[in-house]
UniProtKB/Swiss-Prot annotation:
Membrane-topology descriptor: Lipid-anchor
Lipid group attachment sites (N-palmitoyl cysteine): C46
Source organism per UniProt: Arabidopsis thaliana (Mouse-ear cress)
Pfam families tied to this protein: Abhydrolase_1
Protein's UniProt name: Probable lysophospholipase BODYGUARD 2
Length: 471
C-alpha cells in the first residue's frame, strides 16, 4: 500500500468516526424537529420498530417472529424483492457498536439472557417485543420485510419552490416530465431516441448539451425524448415512494413508451440510467435498436458475497479523497447527514443559482445545478440504495439477456479519469456482452464525458444510429 493510500485511509478513519457521531446526533435532532413541524416522529433506517409510534395508518410486518427495520410503503403496490438491504444494514457505525456493547453489558448484569432452544436472545430484544405487544399494533407477515405507510406531501426539509413542486399542480401528477424535440415542419420521425440521466441529475443533462448540437440531418430524422426520472427535476417526488427499480421502470413505460407509442427506439443512458436502460432492454428486447451506456456502474460480485453490500462498498468507499468519492460515501452511509445537505443546498438551490449567475456575470449556464439540487433526500437516498446498490444481484442476468436475446448494437463510453465509477466497470460489461464496443475518453471524468465535449459526442451518437440503420 502506497503512502498516499495509507494516508487516505487513516484520515478517512477519523473523519468518518466524526461523521458517525454527527449522524447519530442528527438522528435525534430531526426526530425532534419532525415532531414539532410535522406532528410526527417518522422512523428512520437507524431506528427500530418499537420506536415507531403506533398509529392506525401504520403496518409493521414481522420477520420470523422478530422485528426488522421500518421502511416506507411503496405507494399502491408493495414489492419486497425491490428493497435493498443496504437501507437498513449499512454496517454498524462506531457509536452503534459502542451502544450495543453497553446495552449488552447492562442486559447481562441486570436481566440475564433469555434462552430459547438453541437461540440466545438479548433481553433488550425481548423488551422490544413486550413494547410492541403493548402498543396493540396490527401485525402481518409478508415476505420478511417491514414497511410503513407514510404521507405523500413534501417534508418540511424539502424544497417547496414552484419548480420542485410543479408536479403537485400538474394535471397529470402520475407521469414523468418529458422534454421532446420533434423534427421540424411536422415531419414524421424515422426513429426515436430515449435519453435517461444518471444519479442526482435531470433531463437538462441532455437537452442543454446534446440536443442543440445534433446535426440538421439528425434533427429531421429522429425524435429526441429526455425524461426526468421519478424524484428528479420536474417529475413527481412522492414522499411515500421507495423509488424501486420497478417503480422507475413503470413510470418510464407509462410516461414515454406508452404515451408516445414507441415500437422501436434507441437508448442513451448515463451512470444510474444504464441500470434502467438494461432493465428496459430485458422487458422490451424487440424494441431496442441500440444501447449506448455511459459509465455503467456494473461491478462483478465475488461468489459468496452479498451483492448489494459489495456494490455499496465499491461505490462508496469510506475515503476522503477524491472529493467525488467522499461525497458519494457521505450520501450512501449517512441518512441524516444526507438530509442535512438537502436542507442546506437543495432547499436553497434558487439562491445558489442566483449567486452563481451573479459571480459569473451571468456567463455560466446553471443547468447542472438543476440536476444536482432539484430533488428530495427521500428520492435520492432510496434511488441510490434500491437501484445502484440493490441491482448488484440483477445486472449479471440483465447482461446475459442482452447478450443472448437483444439483437442491438451496444456501445459503451467511459471517462479515463472517472473517479466515481472506474473504467473497469465498462470492461466488465464487455466481458459479459462481447459484441459491445468500449470507448475510453482520455482526461474526461464522470461528467465531462459529455459536458464540454457535447459536439463530439453528438457526432459519435449519430454514427451509432446510422450504423444501426445500415445493418
Amino acid at each position: 500500500m502506497g503512502i498516499a493510500r495509507w494516508l487516505n485511509r487513516t484520515v478517512g478513519f477519523f473523519v468518518f468516526a466524526l461523521l458517525d457521531i454527527a449522524d447519530f446526533l442528527l438522528c435525534y435532532t430531526y426526530k425532534t424537529l419532525d415532531y414539532f413541524l410535522e406532528s410526527e416522529r417518522k422512523p428512520c433506517y437507524c431506528s427500530s420498530p418499537p420506536e415507531a409510534k403506533a398509529k392506525t395508518e401504520k403496518i409493521i410486518v414481522s420477520e420470523r417472529g422478530g422485528y426488522s427495520k421500518v421502511v416506507s410503503l411503496t405507494r399502491s403496490k408493495i414489492h419486497f424483492d425491490e428493497i435493498s438491504d443496504t437501507l437498513y444494514s449499512r454496517g454498524p457505525s462506531l457509536l452503534t457498536r459502542l451502544s450495543k456493547l453497553v446495552r449488552s453489558v447492562k442486559c447481562f448484569n441486570y436481566k440475564g439472557l433469555i434462552m430459547r432452544g438453541n437461540v440466545v436472545e438479548s433481553c433488550d430484544h425481548h423488551e422490544s417485543k413486550k413494547k410492541i405487544s403493548k402498543g396493540k399494533k396490527r401485525l402481518m407477515t409478508l415476505n420478511s420485510t417491514v414497511i410503513e405507510k407514510s404521507s405523500t406531501a413534501p417534508r418540511w426539509s424539502d424544497c417547496h419552490c414552484s419548480f420542485c413542486t410543479s408536479w403537485l399542480t400538474s394535471t397529470n401528477r402520475d407521469s414523468l416530465f418529458v422534454k421532446v424535440q420533434q423534427p421540424k415542419d411536422n415531419k414524421k420521425a424515422r426513429d426515436n431516441v430515449v435519453f435517461i440521466h444518471g444519479f442526482v441529475s435531470s433531463s437538462a443533462f441532455w437537452t442543454e448539451t446534446l440536443f442543440p448540437n445534433f446535426s440538421d440531418s439528425a434533427k429531421s430524422n429522429y425524435r429526441f425524448i429526455a425524461v426526468d426520472l421519478l424524484g428528479y427535476g420536474r417529475s413527481p417526488k412522492p414522499n411515500d415512494s421507495l423509488y424501486t427499480l420497478r417503480e422507475h421502470l413503470e413510470m418510464i413505460e407509462k410516461s414515454v413508451i406508452s404515451k408516445f407509442k414507441l415500437k422501436t427506439f434507441h437508448i442513451v443512458a448515463h451512470s444510474l440510467g444504464c441500470i434502467l436502460a438494461l432493465a428496459l432492454a430485458v422487458k422490451h428486447p424487440g424494441a431496442i435498436k441500440s444501447l449506448t451506456l455511459l459509465a455503467p456502474p456494473y461491478y462483478k460480485v465475488p461468489k459468496g458475497v452479498q451483492p448489494a453490500q459489495y456494490v455499496m462498498r465499491e461505490v462508496a468507499r469510506k475515503e476522503v479523497w477524491p472529493p467525488m468519492q467522499f461525497g458519494a460515501s457521505v450520501l450512501s452511509w449517512y441518512e441524516h447527514l444526507g438530509r442535512t445537505i438537502g436542507l442546506v443546498l437543495i432547499k436553497n438551490h434558487q439562491l445558489i443559482e442566483f449567486v452563481t449567475r451573479l459571480l459569473t456575470l451571468n456567463r455560466m449556464r446553471t443547468y447542472l445545478i438543476e440536476g444536482f439540487l432539484c430533488h428530495t433526500h427521500n428520492g435520492s437516498f432510496h434511488t441510490l440504495h434500491n437501484i445502484i446498490f440493490g441491482s448488484g444481484a440483477k445486472l449479471d442476468s440483465y447482461l446475459d439477456h442482452v447478450r443472448d436475446h437483444v439483437d442491438c448494437d451496444v456501445a459503451i463510453f467511459h471517462g479515463g479519469k472517472d473517479e466515481l465509477i472506474p473504467v473497469e466497470c465498462s470492461y466488465s460489461v464487455k466481458s459479459k456482452v462481447p459484441r459491445a464496443t468500449v470507448h475510453v475518453i482520455p482526461d474526461k471524468d464522470h461528467i465531462t464525458i459529455v459536458v464540454g465535449r457535447q459536439k463530439d459526442f453528438a457526432r459519435e451518437l449519430e454514427l451509432i444510429w446510422q450504423r444501426t440503420k445500415s445493418t
